[in-house]
Amino acid sequence: MPPATQAVIKPANPGATPPTADLVALKGRQQASWSSGDYAVVGTTLQIVGEELCEALDLRAGQKVLDVAAGNGNVTLAAARRWCEVTSTDYVPSLLEGGRARASAEGLKIAFKEADAEALPFDDGAFDAVVSTFGVMFTPNQERAAFELLRVCKPGGQIGLANWTPDGFIGQLFKILGKYLPPPAGVKSPALWGTRARLDEIFRPGASSIRAEPRHFNFRYRSPEHFVEVFKTYYGPMLKAFAALDATGQNGLRHDLIALIASLNKASDGTMVVPSEYLEIVITK
């Protein structure tokens, strides 16, 4: 779709109003959730998304790149492999340690810093590019997070995002989890970051252009049951969901997840190949 332009560059600061107690509490629960399990087992399978996002941004050697809600560092490593000066941030220390170990194994020089996506500890316009793959979309205060991404990006710089869409496989998985463990009232779905309308709402005041292209990532597992077992063991949000339910609830959740996979599975040999739509987004400030 053709990009649109906007004359206004400086957005209003949504952080002028302190976050509500509910959002603060939710962030604490999210942090505990992402700290549980071992996200790297799942996260590293998504590496190709980080590589493709770096190509979409056309990153150049020497550019200063900030990865926000970096997890175990997929796009962090992808940018560093292109000789960028990368700073990798997350509010979960164990995830940063995973990224640091991966960088060390490849001999990549990367700065790692614990940071909240809604209150980034960097100066205005400090980075040529700001990136996040399936990370910043989970922030409770979406407006504040978008403001922070724009704030630390230099004028004319780029923000690159990969966000799951509401109707894709992971977006539908979110809806199933929400049926069993409803989010607090008023909390917006992270999958809204995968819609053009929401991107326009939270980024347009400070962006000169927004380009969003649908892409697909294929989840490949030994079987639908294998996917559920891996995610309930290593993916914090699903691990916490199963742990919070009684046996009846766990069986219902497992049944609904298997049914969702069956409805989308491209494999006919007992394995699982399920494409999940996401938006690859390039925002120019």
Give residue spans per PLM region.
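Conserved catalytic/acceptor-binding region of the Class I
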Residues: 143-144, 150, 154-223, 238, ...
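Class I SAM-dependent methyltransferase SAM/SAH-binding core
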Residues: 64-119, 144
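N-terminal acidic, proline/glycine-rich, low-complexity intrinsically disordered segments
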Residues: 1-10
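Conserved class I S-adenosyl-L-methionine
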Residues: 9-11, 15-63, 74, 98, ...
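A short SAM/SAH-binding and catalytic strip from SAM-dependent methyltransferases
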Residues: 129-142
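Conserved Class I S-adenosyl-L-methionine
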Residues: 191-285
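A short acidic, Gly/Pro-enriched loop at the edge of an enzyme's catalytic core
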Residues: 118-129
